[in-house]
Design a protein with these regions (language model features):
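Positively charged, low-complexity intrinsically disordered leader regions
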Residues: 1-28
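Short beta-strand segments
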Residues: 38, 94-98, 163
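Short acidic/histidine-rich motifs immediately flanking catalytic phosphotransfer sites
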Residues: 86-91, 200-203
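Short beta-strand elements in bilobed, periplasmic/extracellular small-molecule ligand-binding domains
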Residues: 56-71, 184-186
Length: 207
């Protein structure tokens, strides 16, 4: 039987929990700081960046916004990331995707310190996820796990089907479900009879 999950209620609860933890860190003299870099003025990216800024304000995280022009060179962007990697007052670095075509996205993401890679895209964090070690995890898949757990949905032993195999959502989603002892199938553009594959799912994630 299908269950309707109210994501907004769960999201608010999580943000309130984070707010409490951030306040505790401030009492210990640590001001949590997130640096967000956007190259160009893609409308969708601008909306995402504004939402991240609002979320930071709500939970008490200091956010630093770096809005770079479309023509910013790859080297200039890498130079900024190196500076942020070295700053002791910056805890997390997030580069808003997509980047302009003249910039190597993979090279940029790999240049972020794994200790500040809050999006979980660095190969070291991806590798940690694969072998079940601690590390940053891609936000959307991590959010799905939180939605399931906080809704009282048992993952262990369930037939879990993930539709999509992207590095950002599909693959980490499958790995997180495996970590929770789900029986995972990944479907994609070459999957035969997608309808039959999805019909057998107890948990279906379209990624």
């Amino acid at each position: 039987m299908a269950q309707l999950i109210d994501g907004k209620v769960i999201s608010t609860k999580i943000k309130d929990e984070v707010k409490e933890k951030v306040a505790g860190l401030k009492e210990q003299g640590c001001e949590v700081t997130l640096a967000v870099i956007q190259v160009g003025a893609d409308p969708a990216s601008s909306v995402y960046v504004r939402n991240k800024k609002k979320a930071c304000e709500y939970v008490g995280i200091r956010s630093l916004a770096y809005e770079l022009p479309e023509e910013t060179t790859e080297e200039k962007l890498l130079e900024l990331i190196r500076e942020l990697n070295d700053r002791t007052d910056v805890n997390g670095i997030l580069v808003q995707l997509p980047l302009p075509k003249h910039i190597d996205e993979e090279k940029v993401l790999d240049s972020i310190s794994p200790l500040k890679d809050v999006d979980g895209f660095h190969p070291r964090n991806v590798g940690a996820l694969c072998i079940g070690k601690p590390g940053f995890v891609s936000c959307t898949p991590a959010g799905v796990i939180q939605l399931l757990k906080r809704s009282g949905i048992e993952i262990a032993g369930k037939e879990c089907v993930v539709v999509g195999r992207s590095n950002i959502v599909g693959k980490p989603m499958a790995l997180l479900l495996l970590r929770e002892n789900g029986t995972v199938t990944v479907a994609h553009s070459r999957t035969k009879d997608l309808k039959e594959v999805t019909k057998r799912a107890d948990i279906l994630v379209v990624a």
